[in-house]
Amino acid sequence: MSSGIFEACRDILALFSVGLAIKLMDDHLDREEADGARLPLAARLGRGVCAYTVLSYALAAWLKPSWAWTLFLASYACGMLGSGAWRLPSGLPGWLETVLAFALGVTAAGWREMASSTAFVMGVQLWDDVVDFAHDRYLTRANLAQRWGRVEAALAGTALLFIALFLAAAKTLLGLLVLPWVLYVAAAPWGKERG
């Protein structure tokens, strides 16, 4: 019994840590698009954001390597989906980095682990696009809910989350449980307002 509780706590902490690493990096990369009354945690960390992101990811990778690797790589691959033929700092086109990230995840943790992480990340991303539909219409790049339609994006997001649940029930359920806490901490609601 106690080993089961320990494992569940370890898994939750691993998911929180990798989720926070992904969110910090995403907020850092999207800092030009940030608005609102409060500074997110990534902005408050300033130049230290990369160090704290790596620290958070390292903790997750130590606690639950296969989940940390595949969730991070799936987030990276999904983040590159819209970049198509753009040349990235690596010199590679975005589509090739997407394929390489997915292949690395499959090699490191197996197809089922990588597929479940990819389905989870894409499902969450689609729902995020649905929720942010009104806000994101002012950005230069349309999100998927704007391209496909809100209902279509919501249905696709739900289907992907069910696929993730089928492939990796514990990771998906715990991930959905941890996600609001990651978003809360990353939003840093306890801090200063923009001035």
Predicted regions: what they are:
Residues S2-M25, W69-A74, G110-W127:
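Membrane-embedded alpha-helical segments that form the functional core of polytopic membrane enzymes
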Residues D26-D35, Y76-S90, D129-R137, A186-R194:
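C-terminal ends of transmembrane helices
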Residues R44-A109:
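Intramembrane alpha-helical segments
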Residues L173-V185:
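Small-residue-rich transmembrane alpha-helices that serve as helix-helix interface/gating elements
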